[in-house]
Amino acid sequence: MLLVVLLAASADLITPYDPVWQIDERLTPPNWDYLLGLDEFGRDVYSRIIYGARVSLYAGIVSVILIALPFGSVMGVLAGYFRGWVDTLLSRLVDIMFAFPTLLLAITIVGVLGPSLTNTMVAIGIVYAPTFARIARGSTLGVSNLDYIVASRTVGAGSARIIVRHVLPNIAAPLIIQTTLALSTAILIEATLSFLGLGTQPPMPSWGTMLGTGRRYMELAPWVAVYPGIAIMIAVLGFNLAGDGLRDALDPRLREA
């Protein structure tokens, strides 16, 4: 995960060519001048993969951290804290969204809004908000009856104060773990939508777009598609391993084991 972040952050320093600059040569195999070869338009594959890391991280951060996490967490905390009709209403909404396959729902949303990176991020954020809502609800139900929270209610503390000062800090750990795991899936969904032509649009470099266009040249120039595929695999694996590590570190039950 750290490797992907560092490559994305230093893309301007470590790429020899502009990712959209077209060289006269086409489908040149990897060599000392072009480390990962050139694509069908004469663009440097290495430079496009490094800049594509920026697109993937940007899509993941916006869709998960800025959309899914806050909206889902608010829904879950409200449902778990107030219960009653609020819990019933929000839980049914979450159940309805869980009834649809994640990728199919994302494709439907982008199909309605139109193909673009922005709409892709909105779609990913919408389909992952229920996951955070369910985790936040379960965690809130577990802490809302603790003695110090009951005591806060008894002395007249408002619901907003209790949620901000007592509930949210106690449910942060599972939400942080889920955020890391969701980032890996968000990168994969963004790549899938771009592969289908619904996500990032040319000439912006995207791993999914590179994989989609490169598949037509698998026999003639396999490097055009293989290297973006490897980049996706490394990024997804890295975030999954980071999520597993955070879970081991933050989950008290696993620490005791």
Predicted regions: what they are:
Residues 2-10, 62, 66, 71, ...:
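Lipid-exposed faces of alpha-helical membrane segments in multi-pass integral membrane proteins
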Residues 35, 39, 45, 67-72, ...:
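Generic hydrophobic transmembrane alpha-helix motif, especially the helices
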Residues 43-58, 83-91, 141-145, 149-177:
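Amphipathic cytosolic juxtamembrane alpha-helices at the membrane-cytosol interface
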Residues 45-78:
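Transmembrane alpha-helix signature in integral membrane proteins
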Residues 54-67, 100, 160-192, 239:
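Transmembrane alpha-helices
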Residues 127, 173-183, 222-257:
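C-terminal transmembrane helix and the adjacent membrane-cytosol boundary/short C-terminal tail
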